[in-house]
Design a protein with these regions (language model features):
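Glycine-rich phosphate-binding loops of nucleotide-dependent enzymes
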Residues: 1-151
Length: 151
């Protein structure tokens, strides 16, 4: 269910010998369904019946419920609808503005420009460029990707 998936990582941290009560699990689920605007009939809905974008939000919520200081998101918006993609990007920006460190991995340059304050370009497992501030532009990103080093 959506509830079980949302609390999974927090339950692992807490320990399976100290399970959340049904009331606690419902409270967490309701809070994160609202926070992430997960479109579901209820917290009891099987996760497989949700859209891909809402499944992605549940997975993101699973980790946010652990209150991490650092979040690594690898292509979190790949294959989901445009509306949900924008919602996730806004959430990432909000988390960063609240002090969370976020590594956002994406192959979409437009998305990188919307979500990143600093961008690292990798090729063959090596860093080939770092862009920030005025350097963050479509042309600079494409030049760095194509092989023009910025270091």
């Amino acid at each position: 269910s959506v509830r079980d998936n949302l609390i999974l990582a927090a339950q692992v941290l807490r320990g399976f010998f100290r399970p959340f009560t049904k009331a606690q699990a419902n409270k967490f689920a309701d809070e994160y369904i609202k926070l992430l605007e997960i479109k579901t009939a209820s917290a009891d809905t099987p996760i497989k019946s949700l859209s891909g974008g809402n499944q992605q939000k549940v997975i993101l919520g699973r980790w946010l419920l652990t209150h991490p200081e650092y979040l690594i998101l690898d292509e979190p918006t790949r294959g989901i609808d445009v509306g949900t993609k924008i919602e996730i990007q806004k959430l990432v920006l909000k988390l960063a503005s609240e002090g969370m460190s976020v590594t956002f991995i994406s192959s979409e340059t437009d998305e990188m420009l919307r979500t990143c304050s600093r961008l690292i370009v990798m090729r063959d497992r090596r860093m080939v460029g770092e862009l920030s501030g005025n350097e963050l532009s479509q042309s600079m990103i494409m030049s760095t990707i194509a092989g023009g080093d910025t270091e």
